[in-house]
């Protein structure tokens, strides 16, 4: 009898250690940086030459903006750039290829109006500061698409209009042409809206979002096979309106909201989760100082910068932090 008790406690300890392997909290530190002069949520961000750019979003007064900002980590300063020719919008997408950023899509206007889903697509030269309008996106699923850089092309994954999608469109940079791809996805990779993604170690990851409930799914986009491959789900409950970025080794998932079945079962996240592609493993690694959705997060030189976003009561913030492990 005593021996069986020891065996029981041994396996209980093994189970505890295996669980801790996923939820342990390696030490991270957050340092407050210079806040963005204008608080914004649902902005579009990208990096170039060790600087962070933020375009568009929603301001404190609820209006959409087309302001374009550049953050320089070395001096911890923000610079407002010249006005962009794009219409003010939220939830647009961007992808940097060489010295240009390809940016557009998004949403602006009244809810569920076709004219509110924006299909315009632009190229901005980060050296000459010239804008050029390119071929329009060929679908109206233009809310929060995930852009992925390919070989001479850009892939636009998912997106939303009035239905959940799983679409992939390929933009040929030389031809200035969009084409819809035939894509395979297993049942464990659902149609969804408000997904997030990032590229790490030459691989492309995407997940979370919403489809009749907040989602935990995580998948890898394989452009050669034109497939979504299921990966280990994120920890905890599902979330929408999260933010995502990658260092050389990890993908980070930050903030967001869990939308429950009723207005009383939803809540916001402050948690930071880290995904290791080589091990297909998630870990909790810390928390932001506040709960928020639709934040901005980017990585420069191995340092993660995160901030802005919507508070639980709909208040937009301009906080800006850097995270170093």
Task: Please report, for each region that a protein language model flagged, where it lies by residue.
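Bacterial Sec-dependent N-terminal signal peptides
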Residues: 1-27
């Amino acid at each position: 009898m005593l021996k069986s008790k020891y065996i029981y406690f041994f396996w209980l300890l093994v189970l505890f250690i295996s669980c801790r392997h996923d939820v342990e909290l390696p030490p991270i530190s957050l340092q407050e940086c210079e806040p963005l002069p204008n608080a914004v949520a649902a902005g579009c961000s990208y990096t170039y030459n060790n600087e962070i750019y933020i375009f568009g979003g929603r301001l404190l007064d609820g209006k959409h903006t087309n302001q374009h900002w550049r953050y320089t980590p070395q001096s911890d300063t923000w610079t407002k750039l010249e006005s962009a020719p794009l219409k003010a919008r939220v939830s647009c997408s961007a992808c940097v290829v060489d010295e240009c950023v390809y940016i557009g899509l998004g949403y602006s206007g009244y809810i569920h109006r076709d004219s509110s889903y924006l299909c315009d697509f632009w190229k901005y030269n980060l050296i000459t500061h010239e804008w050029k309008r390119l071929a329009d996106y060929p679908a109206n699923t233009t809310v929060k698409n995930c852009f992925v850089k390919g070989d001479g092309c850009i892939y636009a994954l998912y997106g939303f209009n009035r239905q959940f999608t799983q679409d992939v469109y390929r933009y040929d940079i030389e031809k200035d042409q969009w084409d819809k791809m035939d894509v395979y996805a297993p049942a464990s990779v659902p149609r969804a809206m408000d997904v997030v993604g990032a590229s790490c170690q030459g691989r492309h990851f995407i997940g979370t979002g919403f489809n009749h409930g907040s989602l935990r799914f995580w998948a890898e986009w394989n452009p050669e096979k034109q497939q979504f491959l299921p990966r280990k789900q994120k920890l905890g409950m599902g979330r929408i309106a999260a933010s995502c970025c990658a260092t050389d080794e990890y993908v980070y998932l930050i903030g967001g909201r869990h939308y429950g079945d009723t207005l009383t079962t939803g809540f916001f996240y402050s948690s930071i989760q880290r995904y290791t592609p080589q091990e297909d493993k998630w870990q909790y690694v810390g928390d932001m100082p506040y709960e928020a959705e639709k934040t901005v997060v980017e990585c420069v030189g191995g340092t993660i910068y995160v901030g802005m976003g919507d508070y639980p009561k709909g208040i937009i913030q301009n906080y800006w932090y850097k995270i170093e492990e």
